[in-house]
C-alpha cells in the first residue's frame, strides 16, 4: 500500500496536483505526476467546475472519540509511537489527513469497555446531581481530545449522549426506555454540567445533540427513545433555558438520526421558538437508512439552518467499503452537509472493545470498522481503508472551505471546494468498470486526466477562475449535475453507467442547470428514465420554471425504479446560453427517476 501524498500538494499557477487511490488498494492517496490546465477545446466527458456557484461552508471530516478508541490510542499504543499516530490523524503535515470534526459520546455507547454515565449513583436518584463527575473521561478520553485539539486548533467538537443516567429513565436502565418527564430539568442540568466540566478541563464544545438516534431503542446497549414532540419540548423548554442560564454558547443540532425520517427534524424546526434561538444550528443526520437527499429537502425548507452528517460507520457488512465511501461522502457533500463523520476513530483487531465482548447480555456493533486499528497485544497501529477514503477529503478541504459547483459525467461523480486561501480541491470517483479519460473545465481552462476503473483522485490547484463555464446541451447532462432543485432527491443509481440519478420525484418538482449552451439550436432530446410508479412527463423550460417551453418528454412506466429505458422527444425554440429548468409533471408522488438527458 502506498502512503499518503506529502503536504497539500498545491502548485502555483495552472499546475494541478493529483493524489489517487485505486480500488485494489495498491495505491492509497499516492502522489501522481502533476498535470496542467490548457485552453484546448472541450470534449464530451467533462466535469465542469464553477466557483461562481457557491453552496455550504464546510466545517470538517472526522470520526468519534469513543471510549474504546481513546483507550486504545492512549493506553494500548506505545507512548513512543503515539505522537506519530496523532499527527497522521489530526494534522496535514506528512501523511496527516487533518481530521477536524470529531464527535464525543456523553457516557457509554456500544463501543465502550463498560456501561457508565457521569452520575450513576448506584442507580439511585440524584436530582441535584451532587455526585456528577467526569472522572471516567479524565483517564484517557480527555487527554486524547486535548492532544488532538492542540494539533488541530480548528477542530470542531460535538457531544452526544446515548443515554442519561438510568435513574432518569422509565426502564431504570441505560438501555432502552424513555426519559421520565419528572426528570426533564435534571436531564438539561446533566448536559450543562457535562459541558461545564469539560470546559473547566480545557475543552469547549461547539455543538451538542440531546439524544443519539432518538428513534432507536434497544435492550442491548445504551439508548433512549425520544419522539419529535418530546425532543421539541425538552429542547425548547429545558435545555435551551439551561444553556442560556449557564452562559454557554454551545449550539444544538436537532434529531441526530437517519435520513429516512425527515419529518422528525421538520417537526422540531417548525417551532417558532426553536427557529428564533441563536443556539439552534440545524440538523444532525446519520446514514444507515433512507435517501441522503433528505438533507437537502430539510435544508430547502429551513434555509437558515445547517446540515451535518454526524455518523455513518463502515462495517464488515459492506462488500466494498472503498466504493461505498466515495459514492456516499461525495453525495453527502452535494446535499448540503457541512461535515462527514465516521463512527469509532479506532478499534482493535477483533473490532472491539465493545459491549458484546462483556458476555453479560449486552450487545451492539461488533462488526463496525474504524479509521485505524490498534492491535491489543502489540499496540501497533494500522491505517484502515477508511483512513484513506476519508483522507481524500479531509486533507485537502480546509475548515471554512465552501462547496462550489461541479458536474458529474456518466461514469464519474465529483464534488468541488474552494478553500479559505482560494485554492481549489476536486474529488472525483470513477464508478465504472472501465478507465475514464475525463476533462475538468474550470472557467475557460481545462485539463485532461485518465482515471482507472473504480479509482478516486483529489485534484488541487490555485489561481483565479477566468470566465464562466458553459455546458453544451448536446453533452449527456447528468440529472445529478443540477445547480439547485426542489421536490426531488439524488440517489445512487442502478443504471449500467453507475453514478447518481434523480428520484423521489413529486409533481411540480424541478431541477436547474445553469449556463447551458444550445448553440444555433436543437431539434430533439433523449431522456434516460425509470419508473415503478405512475409515470408522467418532463418539461424543459428556459430561464425559469414557467419560461419558454423547449420540449416535453413522456416518462413511461418501466416496471421498476431501476428498470431503465431511453425516450426521445422533439425540441424547438432554444439557442444560445440559458439556465435550463426541467419540470416533472404527473398526478401522484413518485413520477419517475431520471439519470440523464441529452439534446441533439
Spans of model-derived segments:
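Aromatic/acidic polysaccharide-binding cleft in carbohydrate-active enzymes
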Residues: 306-389, 405-408
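Extracytoplasmic
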Residues: 3, 465-600
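N-terminal catalytic cores of secreted or lumenal carbohydrate-active enzymes
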Residues: 25-205, 237
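Conserved, mostly hydrophobic/aromatic
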Residues: 63, 98, 157, 208, ...
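Catalytic cores of secreted or luminal carbohydrate-active enzymes
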Residues: 344, 373, 377-402, 462-496
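Beta-strand-rich binding/interaction modules
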Residues: 433-461, 536-542
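Active-site neighborhood of glycoside hydrolase catalytic domains
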Residues: 186-207, 214-315
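Carbohydrate-binding surface patches
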Residues: 395, 406-443, 454
Amino acid at each position: 500500500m502506498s502512503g499518503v501524498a506529502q503536504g497539500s500538494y498545491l502548485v502555483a499557477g495552472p499546475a494541478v496536483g493529483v493524489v489517487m487511490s485505486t480500488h485494489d488498494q495498491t495505491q492509497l492517496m499516492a502522489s501522481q505526476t502533476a498535470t496542467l490546465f490548457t485552453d484546448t477545446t472541450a470534449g464530451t466527458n467533462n466535469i465542469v467546475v464553477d466557483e461562481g456557484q457557491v453552496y455550504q461552508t464546510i466545517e470538517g471530516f472526522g470520526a468519534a472519540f469513543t471510549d474504546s478508541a481513546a483507550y486504545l490510542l492512549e493506553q494500548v499504543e506505545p507512548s513512543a509511537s503515539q505522537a506519530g499516530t496523532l499527527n497522521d490523524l489530526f494534522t496535514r503535515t506528512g501523511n496527516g489527513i487533518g481530521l477536524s470534526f470529531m464527535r464525543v459520546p456523553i457516557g457509554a455507547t456500544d463501543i465502550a469497555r463498560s456501561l457508565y454515565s457521569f452520575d450513576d449513583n448506584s442507580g439511585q436518584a440524584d436530582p441535584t446531581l451532587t455526585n456528577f463527575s467526569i472522572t471516567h473521561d479524565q483517564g484517557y478520553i480527555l487527554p486524547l481530545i486535548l492532544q488532538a485539539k492542540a494539533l488541530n486548533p480548528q477542530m470542531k467538537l460535538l457531544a452526544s449522549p446515548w443515554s442519561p443516567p438510568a435513574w432518569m429513565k422509565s426502564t431504570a436502565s441505560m438501555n432502552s426506555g424513555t426519559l421520565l418527564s419528572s426528570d426533564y430539568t435534571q436531564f438539561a442540568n446533566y448536559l450543562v454540567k457535562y459541558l461545564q466540566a469539560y470546559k473547566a478541563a480545557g475543552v469547549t464544545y461547539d455543538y451538542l445533540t440531546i439524544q443519539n438516534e432518538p428513534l432507536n431503542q434497544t435492550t442491548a446497549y445504551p439508548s433512549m427513545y425520544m419522539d419529535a414532540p418530546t425532543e421539541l419540548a425538552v429542547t425548547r423548554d429545558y435545555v435551551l433555558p439551561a444553556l442560556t442560564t449557564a452562559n454557554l454558547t454551545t449550539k444544538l443540532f436537532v434529531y441526530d438520526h437517519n435520513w429516512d425520517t425527515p419529518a422528525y427534524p421538520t417537526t422540531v424546526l417548525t417551532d417558532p421558538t426553536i427557529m428564533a434561538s441563536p443556539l439552534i444550528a440545524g440538523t444532525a443526520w446519520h446514514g444507515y437508512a433512507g435517501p441522503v437527499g433528505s438533507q437537502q429537502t430539510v435544508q430547502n425548507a429551513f434555509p437558515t439552518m445547517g446540515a451535518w452528517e454526524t455518523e455513518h460507520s463502515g462495517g464488515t457488512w459492506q462488500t466494498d467499503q472503498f466504493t461505498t465511501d466515495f459514492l456516499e461522502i461525495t453525495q453527502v457533500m452535494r446535499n448540503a452537509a457541512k461535515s462527514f463523520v465516521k463512527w469509532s476513530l479506532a478499534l482493535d483487531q477483533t473490532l472491539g472493545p465493545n459491549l458484546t465482548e462483556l458476555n453479560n447480555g449486552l450487545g451492539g456493533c461488533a462488526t463496525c470498522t474504524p479509521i485505524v486499528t490498534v492491535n491489543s497485544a502489540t499496540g501497533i497501529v494500522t491505517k484502515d481503508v477508511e483512513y484513506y477514503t476519508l483522507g481524500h477529503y479531509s486533507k485537502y478541504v480546509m475548515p471554512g472551505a465552501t462547496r462550489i459547483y461541479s458536474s458529474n459525467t456518466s461514469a464519474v461523480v465529483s464534488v468541488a471546494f474552494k478553500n479559505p486561501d482560494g485554492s481549489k480541491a476536486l474529488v472525483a470517483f470513477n464508478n465504472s468498470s472501465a478507465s475514464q479519460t475525463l476533462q475538468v473545465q474550470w472557467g475557460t481552462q481545462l485539463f485532461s486526466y485518465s482515471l482507472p476503473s473504480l479509482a478516486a483522485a483529489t485534484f488541487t490547484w490555485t489561481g483565479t477562475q477566468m470566465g464562466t463555464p458553459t455546458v453544451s446541451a448536446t453533452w449527456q447532462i447528468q440529472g445529478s449535475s443540477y445547480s439547485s432543485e426542489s421536490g426531488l432527491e439524488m440517489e445512487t443509481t442502478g443504471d449500467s453507467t453507475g453514478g447518481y440519478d434523480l428520484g423521489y420525484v413529486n409533481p411540480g418538482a424541478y431541477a436547474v442547470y445553469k449556463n447551458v449552451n444550445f448553440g444555433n439550436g436543437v431539434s430533439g432530446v433523449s431522456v434516460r428514465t425509470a419508473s415503478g410508479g405512475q409515470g408522467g412527463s418532463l418539461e424543459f423550460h428556459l430561464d425559469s420554471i414557467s419560461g419558454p417551453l423547449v420540449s416535453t418528454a413522456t416518462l413511461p412506466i418501466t416496471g421498476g425504479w431501476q428498470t431503465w429505458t431511453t425516450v426521445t422527444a422533439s425540441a424547438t425554440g432554444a439557442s444560445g446560453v440559458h439556465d435550463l429548468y426541467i419540470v416533472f409533471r404527473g398526478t401522484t408522488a413518485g413520477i419517475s427517476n431520471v439519470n440523464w438527458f441529452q439534446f441533439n
